């Protein structure tokens, strides 16, 4: 077999403890199992096999969205620091848990290296307790990059580094960080340290990990206003139009139009507008000669690209659509809810999204069931040639009925009698090879993944209603 050699950034595992409905540690894994079905879309090298898709099913209030929120929390912690409303996000079914740290661990292929990053935080007070980063070698040996213990005021640069000056430099910054219990060291070491990375190339592993969280991980939920990679550009408009047309929207062409700044200022909160502009100005400081920093702001039925031109002037653009006639163009508000949702999701199908991880809650919101299935079929076919990873939550059982998913691409979230969310990969149930997953959900084999109705209470309500 010829092993793949391209540079990769892919998610391996994500673990969470004492966060929202997760009490004891729950591990979400993208590691491939023994299934032979659709093996072309499994990434493999000498040491690991990874799936590129994971669909998470579960009853209402089982905790599916809480897993997505856990991803979002970790990303926010790394990029922006503690998000608002964090103090009550521990597992509150057990009051004593407010005094127990919440823990998060993420395992990645980062430039083909197996990297593990983890931290623990006491959410009730917002105090970070521990943080560490290390590499796991092919022989399963740990090579520490750094270890930070804020309870004991300890910081140690690890044996990952070979250069003595690099170790001294990292320890210097690390020792300064042990008094700050609200910020992760990974965040601190990635603000205003460009010269340090130039002078100490070994430290770039810290920069690469930060970039993964900032640019290669996209977390989306139905209510979020997202700022991210501006994927609507003149270079890929045809690709987007062709995809939208193939998915049955009737759209045949797109064009980019400029929007007056005053109109946008009146549409979005001043705080958000200022944050987007501030982020662009920070990017502008280190941009190359030909690079114009840009960011996309998107919410329901509105897409805007903010960019600074060569003179650092702010330019805001949006997109318009034509159907059969290219002489008439419409804005997004004039399109259907389904088309707006497709535009929110189309990024996962673009070539520029290779090597990225998308975590999306309620992918089927506003989409016709057939559209959801067709879009997933298209993504899974493209996954044979790309290394984009897609993690979604869904209630759409037709995805199971269509039999387009491998068993190791399916995960269930159930809630036990204690109110704890439990992650159960489908492979845990050890279905027979000839057993169809859709049938197993309704014949009792997978009964614990379905909503738990109280038939006795329902009959009582009906009886009372008739009396």
Question: Where do the language-model regions lie?
Answer:
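Short Pro/Gly-enriched beta-strand edge/turn motifs at strand-loop
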Residues: 86-90, 298-303, 394-397
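A structural signal for short, well-ordered beta-strand segments and their strand-loop junctions
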Residues: 105, 116-118, 250-258, 359, ...
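Coil-to-beta-strand transition motifs
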Residues: 9, 23, 99-101, 112-115, ...
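Extended helical coiled-coil dimerization/tether regions that scaffold
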Residues: 222-334, 456, 460-462, 466-467
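Electropositive, glycine-dotted interaction segments
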Residues: 120-276
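Conserved P-loop NTP-binding catalytic core
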Residues: 43-50, 54-55, 59, 68-126
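P-loop NTPase motor core
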Residues: 95-161, 413, 425-434, 440
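Switch/communication elements of ASCE P-loop NTPase nucleotide-binding domains
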Residues: 1-79, 313-455, 461-467
């Amino acid at each position: 077999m010829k092993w793949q050699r391209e540079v990769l950034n892919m998610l391996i595992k994500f673990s969470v403890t004492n966060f929202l409905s997760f009490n004891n540690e729950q591990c979400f894994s993208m590691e491939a199992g023994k299934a032979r079905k659709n093996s072309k879309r499994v990434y493999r090298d000498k040491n690991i096999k990874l799936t590129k898709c994971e669909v998470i099913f579960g009853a209402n209030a089982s905790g599916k969205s809480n897993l997505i929120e856990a991803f979002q929390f970790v990303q926010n912690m790394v990029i922006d620091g503690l998000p608002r409303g964090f103090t009550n996000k521990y597992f509150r079914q057990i009051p004593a848990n407010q005094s127990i740290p919440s823990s998060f661990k993420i395992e990645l292929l980062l430039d083909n290296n197996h990297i593990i990053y983890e931290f623990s935080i006491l959410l009730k007070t917002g105090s970070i307790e521990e943080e560490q980063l290390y590499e796991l070698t092919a022989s399963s040996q740990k090579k520490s990059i750094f270890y930070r213990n804020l309870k004991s005021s300890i910081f140690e640069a690890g044996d990952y580094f070979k250069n003595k000056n690099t170790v001294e430099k990292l320890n210097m910054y690390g020792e300064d960080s042990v008094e700050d219990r609200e910020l992760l060291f990974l965040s601190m070491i990635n603000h205003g340290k460009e010269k340090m990375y130039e002078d100490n190339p070994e430290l770039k592993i810290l920069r690469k990990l930060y970039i993964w969280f900032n640019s290669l991980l996209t977390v989306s939920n139905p209510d979020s206003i997202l700022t991210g990679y501006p994927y609507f550009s003149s270079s890929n408009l045809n690709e987007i139009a062709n995809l939208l047309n193939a998915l049955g929207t009737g759209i045949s062409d797109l064009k980019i139009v400029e929007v007056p700044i005053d109109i946008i200022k009146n549409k979005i909160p001043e705080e958000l507008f200022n944050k987007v502009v501030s982020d662009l100005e920070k990017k502008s400081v280190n941009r190359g000669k030909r690079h114009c920093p840009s960011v996309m702001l998107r919410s329901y039925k509105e897409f805007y690209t903010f960019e600074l031109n060569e003179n650092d002037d702010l330019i805001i653009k949006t997109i318009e659509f034509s159907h059969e006639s290219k002489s008439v163009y419409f804005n997004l508000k004039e399109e259907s809810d389904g088309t707006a949702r497709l535009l929110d999701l189309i990024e996962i199908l673009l070539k520029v999204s290779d090597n990225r991880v998308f975590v999306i809650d309620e992918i089927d919101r506003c989409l016709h069931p057939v559209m959801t299935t067709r879009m997933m079929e298209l993504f899974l076919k493209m996954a044979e040639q790309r290394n984009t990873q897609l993690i979604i939550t869904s209630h759409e059982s037709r995805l199971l009925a269509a039999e387009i998913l491998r068993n190791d691409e399916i995960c269930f979230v159930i809630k036990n009698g204690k109110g704890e969310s439990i992650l159960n990969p489908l492979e845990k149930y050890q279905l027979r090879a000839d057993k169809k997953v859709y049938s197993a959900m309704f014949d009792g084999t997978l009964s614990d993944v379905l909503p738990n109705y109280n038939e006795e209470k329902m009959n009582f309500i009906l009886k009372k209603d008739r009396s």
